[in-house]
Amino acid sequence: MRSSRNVTALFGQGYRNFLDLLYPRRCPLCHRILRNSHQLICPDCAGDLRPVSGPRCYKCGKPVNGDEEYCRDCSAHPGAFDQGRGIFLYDDRMRYSIMKYKYFGCQEYSRFYGKALYIYGKDLLAVWKPQIIIPVPLHRRKQRIRGFNQAELLAKELSQLCRDSCRYCYSKKVPCYPITEKTGCG
């Protein structure tokens, strides 16, 4: 029995190595191939990460001055959600990375972003103590176009790290326009 487990483990490792060779993991910020398949980000880009710190908007989590409760955007246009948190400053590199993740099929970025959510959100997770993690649903038409729902993949990664369950309780019946189309940003 023991030797069959070893053979299975060896086969599994060989299969993962083959997949790494065929589809190498890439850095989510610079998109270069990572030397080590266990890395989630290259060392150069790891030093460039800029986590959000200090006072934040109570609504969206963007950095604000110490005496402000809400950022300019949330003061002008309250969103349809109660509270959100970003973990990194949304600069050009982060915007490019998220665009590659969502629209160009870079599903492997889920491991990096899930782990980053866990590491940089540990304090908030300790306060919230979630029992389940529910991803934001994606309309089936958008999911067909993208091939996956990034919120679902992030929820799975985060729930594994938190040892919580990830449930899919909702489905989106009505398609909506991307935020960039609503605001004219992009």
Regions found by a protein language model. Name each.
Residues 1-186:
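Glycine-rich phosphate/pyrophosphate-handling loop used in enzymes and phosphotransfer proteins
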